[in-house]
Amino acid sequence: MSHTFFNSRLLQYKSPFGAVTANTQVTWHLDVPENFGYVDPHLVLTKDRETPVHYRMEFTGQSQGANHFQVKVTPTSSGLYFYYFDLYTDFRKICRGAGAEGFLTWTLKDSWQLTVYEPDFSTPFWIKNGTMYQIFPDRFNEGVPNKEMPFADRIYREDKTGDPYFWPTEQEEGYLNRDYFGGDFLGIEQKLPYLKNLGISCIYLNPIFEAHANHRYNTANYLKADPLLGTNEDFARLCLAAKKEGIRIILDGVFSHTGSDSLYFNREGRYGPGGAYRDRHSPYRSWYDFDSGYACGYRSWWGFDTLPEVQEESPSYVEFVCGKGGVIDTWLGLGASGFRLDVADELPDAFIEKIRAAVKAHGEDKLLIGEVWEDATTKEGFGHRRTYLRGHGLDTTMNYPFRNAAIDFVRGADAAEIADRILSICENYPPPALDCCMNFLSTHDTERAITAIADEPANGRDRFWQSGRRIPLSRMEDAVRRELLAYALIFALPGVPCIYYGDEIAMQGYRDPFNRAFYDWHSTERRLRGPLANLAELRRSCDA
């Protein structure tokens, strides 16, 4: 059918660009060929899951063989809006929607998105021209060598060069993540000069609370540092030392579940006779959902019986996390500058808003990042559209869409398609959130950057296959160049680049646990460190 032109990413057709605050006037322009004949175009704007509203467009003139129309609308409340154009002719109504490549269709193909966020939404300025560095605490650097294990069921790894264990030991029914390489707070403190020279301004630490697995996502005690890392006082000293180097530290907040082996649940009995599992009168009982309908007798995270889910609506749990003297208050008081929320899209919006209030009570400069793997503006959960990126929840999110786009690009994907994916996030995210998105190539949940870029996809192959994989030396030069190109893209895009520990020396590895090896401080790989430090310096000196 006939062609009509509109491009949501060009200011001549929609202004302002992208997301807007509530009570901001938005102007749309539409071009229709003169030879189309009579046409009466309307903007159809729909707030998410509400009734569409039609706005008649005004004719503004002719030029270059096209009739020009415009309409101005001011959304008065935050939310997710969708829009398209209806064109009424002498004969019938036709549509112009996203995905139609400029052509009119009899039926709507798709709509454009308009994100409207709260006018007072702001995010910490200090993070925006800096560079983050993610550390898996057990695997970075051991400051106190030859440790005594604080619990008998932990295995100390004296050999720092081997793969993390990926099979059950003779004492285990399944792989329990109980091998420890001994990384600690002092080890991180010792490497602060190295991180400063790399251009790092913020360290993101995977969980540090007492827990009985090396990943520490099965929290045992929220108010106590894991003894293998050090004490709460050691953490405070680390924060103070980092601050002197111009580096802030944010923590991983795991609030959707605890460990079964914890002070709160205590299925294994490590913490005496109390705990929700053993004592019906435990003060923690209301945190959990006990029901014989569950395979293990209680609701657990994705069916893992070692990770009982908490009920985030429980008043006592909310108070424990968000109240005075609670988890957030304690760790921010010790010197942390914010939190990254594990599985944020599995936390209720109301709970996230309470977490935000607790974080910001320590200052508007405190940061709250959410783990979301998709476009966070359109994410659904709990039977409704999530609202956590509109100004009253998260500051920002982890930017998996950018990560996937950067890796696909250096692996040879079509540049125009990659640009479209990147621009979609830029268009949908509120600028305060976009400016501090956590942009990365690797994390503890993904393949190492160089592995994802230059090695064969695992495609479901078992851990024994993954453990033996290394990129051939003959291909390493090309692999390093591609990784650097991907990082250059990440550094150049809106948001905050984040280097996963060891990426700067081209550490390899597929997913857990192979992406969590101990940092090789004897590595002779130097091809990435200098360029990454230069990229960090360029960001720091650039106002854009």
Residue ranges and their predicted role:
Residues 131-133, 203-205, 249-251, 339, ...:
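Hydrophobic faces of well-ordered beta-strands that scaffold small-molecule active sites
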Residues 1-133, 201, 362:
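Glycan-association/targeting regions that enable binding to alpha-glucans and other polysaccharides
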Residues 30, 135, 195, 205, ...:
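Conserved, mostly hydrophobic/aromatic
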Residues 136-202, 208-334, 355-361:
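Substrate-binding/active-site clefts of carbohydrate-active enzymes
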Residues 32-34, 47, 73-77, 89, ...:
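Short, flexible loop/turn elements at secondary-structure junctions
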Residues 124-129, 196-198, 243-244, 332, ...:
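Extracellular/periplasmic catalytic domains that process cell-envelope and extracellular macromolecules
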Residues 239-248, 256-257, 262-273, 327, ...:
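Active-site-proximal helices and loops of the catalytic beta/alpha 8
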Residues 127, 143-180, 374, 412-413, ...:
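Loop/helix patches that line or flank the sugar-binding groove of alpha-linked glycan CAZymes
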